[in-house]
């Protein structure tokens, strides 16, 4: 969802290296958007393949992910760090290391006796949907902040919002 907020509706997604990609301009920078087409837990395969093909350094990677440890609609920006139990991030870290910035979007805790993978793929309840949509609507401004001012400024502006 977050990547779609950055996409150019006049362009088509291209299938390559286990991902759908699109080049866009953000804050004067040419940016490669990517949506891995692997299983979520294998996202690192697509990320590593694209980074190798396009010769992208790990510190030029920006990853969006969901986070069940954040309330719905909360945003957390990080310069680097652990996977925090998120299997897609875990796989990316296994493939390229952990020295890349990431933006996490809260999806709330998984209810007891509910399958976690079904929880993160499920539609939001009518009560939670507005909070998540508000968070996702901040993506263009957040990413522009990242390119113009850096991840630290994004952390100041958006963490906990």
Enumerate the predicted regions with their spans.
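Gly/charged, well-structured mid-domain segments that form the phosphate/adenylate-handling core
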Residues: 107
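Conserved TIR/SEFIR loop-to-helix hotspot centered on a Trp-containing motif
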Residues: 83
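Nucleotide and nucleotide-moiety/phosphate-recognizing core
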Residues: 1-80, 90, 94-103, 111-115, ...
């Amino acid at each position: 969802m977050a990547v779609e907020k950055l996409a150019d509706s006049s362009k088509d997604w291209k299938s390559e290296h286990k991902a759908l990609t699109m080049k866009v301009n953000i804050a004067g920078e040419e940016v490669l958007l990517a949506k891995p087409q692997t299983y979520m837990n294998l996202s690192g395969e697509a990320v590593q393949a694209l980074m190798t093909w396009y010769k992208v350094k790990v510190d030029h990677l920006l990853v969006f992910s969901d986070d069940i440890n954040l309330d719905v609609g909360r945003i957390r920006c990080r310069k680097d760090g652990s996977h925090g139990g998120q299997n897609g991030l875990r796989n990316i870290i296994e493939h390229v290391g952990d020295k890349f910035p990431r933006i996490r979007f809260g999806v709330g805790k998984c209810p007891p006796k509910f399958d976690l993978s079904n929880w993160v793929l499920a539609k939001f309840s009518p009560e939670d949907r507005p909070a998540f949509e508000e968070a996702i609507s901040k993506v263009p401004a957040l990413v522009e902040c990242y390119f113009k001012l850096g991840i630290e400024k994004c952390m100041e502006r958006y963490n906990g919002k």
